[in-house]
């Protein structure tokens, strides 16, 4: 009789180890991958000094960036631009979404010093706009919302002119408690990604619920009507354009005014495959339709991600 696999606390499980814990449908490591089209090629910067400087700053303060942990294709561009998205509450997620490259496992307890370290790092880097995200922490009673609030409070103590965008998980089953934690220290922009269409949620976001996510965005907006809410979607996972447009309309119906829409890229052979590469002209059409729907800001393009040029989008600039 075989013994059940037991995860060790604080250990990162990725790729084959991550998908072997609980088998994920539609993943075949031996599958033939779609060839990337010409518009999906990234030109790396010639000078990596700025990139290394940001990485060193993160390491010095013991912080994580989602740029590295999720293998974002824009890391070189954003780091060279002097921007990064900080990932709080550790680098181990309690969920195992098969599109995501962040490690799965049993995370360590939150670091009580992290909010101060984060504030000091932002001060050292002289950042005027920051994005803070986190892994899912279904192991915590408030799902990590209190830690977000502490980070916002500490950042504002010594960086009063820095704008703060938070990209939050769905706070599963604790929406009211989470929003109560944030009420005294709200962000400047509240971001929560729907990721894709409800028909594919069971395959793409196991443990999540489309209606929960809409409820989170709706209830935050009801509490803070003057704070912009934002959400992001990936395309190329088997959805139809009509389904994406329906999700965009759901977002508008729930008060969301900022949208990001980009191409899904498969991090490894142990992740969901790309069903198709969406051409740039279709992203242009999505942006046009988003504007007609009433989105104030819509960043749509193959390499667009939730926090890609978030400062530019928040100020009303065109991102594509």
From Swiss-Prot:
<feature type="binding site">
    <location>
        <position position="72"/>
    </location>
    <ligand>
        <name>[4Fe-4S] cluster 1</name>
    </ligand>
</feature>
<keyword id="KW-0408">Iron</keyword>
<feature type="binding site">
    <location>
        <position position="307"/>
    </location>
    <ligand>
        <name>[4Fe-4S] cluster 1</name>
    </ligand>
</feature>
<feature type="binding site">
    <location>
        <position position="78"/>
    </location>
    <ligand>
        <name>[4Fe-4S] cluster 1</name>
    </ligand>
</feature>
<keyword id="KW-0479">Metal-binding</keyword>
<protein>
    <recommendedName>
        <fullName>Lipoyl synthase</fullName>
        <ecNumber>2.8.1.8</ecNumber>
    </recommendedName>
</protein>
<feature type="domain" description="Radical SAM core">
    <location>
        <begin position="79"/>
        <end position="296"/>
    </location>
</feature>
<dbReference type="InterPro" id="IPR007197">
    <property type="entry name" value="rSAM"/>
</dbReference>
<feature type="binding site">
    <location>
        <position position="67"/>
    </location>
    <ligand>
        <name>[4Fe-4S] cluster 1</name>
    </ligand>
</feature>
<dbReference type="InterPro" id="IPR003698">
    <property type="entry name" value="Lipoyl_synth"/>
</dbReference>
<dbReference type="GO" id="GO:0016992">
    <property type="term" value="F:lipoate synthase activity"/>
</dbReference>
<dbReference type="InterPro" id="IPR006638">
    <property type="entry name" value="Elp3/MiaA/NifB-like_rSAM"/>
</dbReference>
<keyword id="KW-0949">S-adenosyl-L-methionine</keyword>
<feature type="binding site">
    <location>
        <position position="93"/>
    </location>
    <ligand>
        <name>[4Fe-4S] cluster 2</name>
    </ligand>
</feature>
<feature type="binding site">
    <location>
        <position position="100"/>
    </location>
    <ligand>
        <name>[4Fe-4S] cluster 2</name>
    </ligand>
</feature>
<dbReference type="GO" id="GO:0051539">
    <property type="term" value="F:4 iron, 4 sulfur cluster binding"/>
</dbReference>
<comment type="pathway">
    <text>Protein modification; protein lipoylation via endogenous pathway; protein N(6)-(lipoyl)lysine from octanoyl-[acyl-carrier-protein]: step 2/2.</text>
</comment>
<feature type="binding site">
    <location>
        <position position="97"/>
    </location>
    <ligand>
        <name>[4Fe-4S] cluster 2</name>
    </ligand>
</feature>
<keyword id="KW-0808">Transferase</keyword>
<dbReference type="GO" id="GO:0005737">
    <property type="term" value="C:cytoplasm"/>
</dbReference>
<dbReference type="InterPro" id="IPR013785">
    <property type="entry name" value="Aldolase_TIM"/>
</dbReference>
<dbReference type="Pfam" id="PF04055">
    <property type="entry name" value="Radical_SAM"/>
</dbReference>
<keyword id="KW-0004">4Fe-4S</keyword>
<keyword id="KW-0411">Iron-sulfur</keyword>
<dbReference type="GO" id="GO:0046872">
    <property type="term" value="F:metal ion binding"/>
</dbReference>
<keyword id="KW-0963">Cytoplasm</keyword>
<comment type="similarity">
    <text>Belongs to the radical SAM superfamily. Lipoyl synthase family.</text>
</comment>
């Amino acid at each position: 009789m075989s013994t059940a696999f037991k995860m060790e606390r604080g250990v990162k499980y990725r790729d084959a180890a991550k998908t072997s814990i609980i088998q994920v449908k539609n993943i075949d490591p031996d599958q033939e991958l779609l060839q990337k089209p010409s518009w999906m090629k990234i030109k790396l910067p010639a000078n990596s000094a700025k990139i290394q400087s940001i990485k060193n700053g993160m390491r010095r303060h013991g912080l994580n960036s989602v740029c590295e942990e999720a293998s974002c294709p824009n890391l070189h561009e954003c780091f060279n631009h002097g921007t990064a998205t900080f990932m709080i509450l550790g680098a181990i997620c309690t969920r195992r979404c098969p599109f995501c490259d962040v490690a799965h496992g049993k995370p360590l307890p939150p670091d009580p010093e992290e909010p101060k370290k984060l504030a000091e790092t932002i001060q050292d880097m002289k950042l005027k706009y920051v994005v803070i995200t986190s892994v899912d922490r279904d192991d915590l009673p408030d799902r990590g919302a209190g830690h977000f609030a502490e980070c916002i409070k500490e950042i504002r103590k010594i960086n009063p002119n820095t704008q703060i965008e938070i990209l939050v998980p769905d706070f599963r089953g604790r929406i009211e408690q989470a929003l109560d934690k944030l009420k005294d220290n709200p962000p400047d922009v509240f971001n929560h990604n729907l990721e894709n269409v409800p028909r594919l949620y069971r395959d793409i976001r196991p443990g999540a619920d489309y209606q929960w996510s809409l409820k989170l965005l709706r209830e935050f907006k009801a509490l803070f009507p003057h704070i912009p809410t934002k959400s992001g979607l990936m395309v190329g996972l088997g959805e139809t354009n009509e389904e994406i447009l329906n999700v965009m309309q759901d977002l508008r119906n729930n008060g969301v005014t900022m949208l990001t829409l980009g191409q899904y890229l498969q991090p490894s052979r142990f992740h969901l495959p790309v069903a198709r590469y969406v051409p740039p002209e279709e992203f242009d059409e999505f942006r046009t339709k988003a504007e007609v729907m009433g989105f104030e800001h819509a960043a749509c393009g193959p390499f667009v991600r939730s926090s890609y040029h978030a400062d530019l989008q928040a100020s009303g600039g065109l991102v594509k």
